[in-house]
């Protein structure tokens, strides 16, 4: 049986202080409705990191999943790029 479509996002880890949880900031560019300037908007997602492998400033891929807690609806798929 195949899984349904799940959203994925690439973002930067902003916090890894919690156990098995990371906070990922995802940048989205939107055009201002009146003035047309492109603005960077940031959304923060709490994601499940089972092995505590992601660290601050890592670039990560997260995927939507079932609710894991009050705020967690995402999980870590892979670390795209390690922080320098």
Swiss-Prot record:
It comes from Clostridium kluyveri (strain ATCC 8527 / DSM 555 / NBRC 12016 / NCIMB 10680 / K1). This is Small ribosomal subunit protein uS17. The keyword Cell wall biogenesis/degradation does not apply. InterPro entries: NA-bd_OB-fold, Ribosomal_uS17, Ribosomal_uS17_bact/chlr. It comes from the Bacteria. One of its GO terms (molecular function) is rRNA binding. One of its GO terms (biological process) is translation. One of its GO terms (cellular component) is cytosolic small ribosomal subunit. NCBIfam families: PRK05610.1 (NF004123), uS17_bact (TIGR03635). Part of the 30S ribosomal subunit. The lineage of its organism: Bacteria, Bacillati, Bacillota, Clostridia, Eubacteriales. One of the primary rRNA binding proteins, it binds specifically to the 5'-end of 16S ribosomal RNA. Transmembrane segments: none annotated.
